[in-house]
Amino acid sequence: MKYSELGQSGIKVSKLCLGSMTWGSQNSQEDANRQIEISLDHGINFLDTAEMYPTTPRSIETQGDTERIIGHWFNKSRQRSNIVLATKITGKGFKSIRNGEPISILSLRTALEG
């Protein structure tokens, strides 16, 4: 696996990233666990998520499931320190995300802290 330096942090990030957009809708916790383990076995240490995942299809019932799946894996595996996790927020407009409110310090804090 090839790696890049994350700024001047000393952290090495794999050039390949495991996306999680379908975890919680098209893929189960068990599927995600298996995908993460296979990725780690191949040197991938970079996971990507977003507050609006899963998006296939996007629904209020599944919104946030991807992050819960990753959190469950972290808790079970005790390998959080081995993973570089990227996340994203979405803008205003989706009622299922932050009740459609615009991005603000308060909405960011709520999204991060639950």
Q: Where is each model-derived feature located?
A:
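N-terminal binding-site loop/beta-alpha segment at the start of enzyme catalytic domains
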Residues: M1-V84
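Substrate-binding cleft and catalytic face of glycoside hydrolase catalytic domains
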Residues: A86-S96
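Glycine/proline-rich, positively charged
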Residues: K95-G114
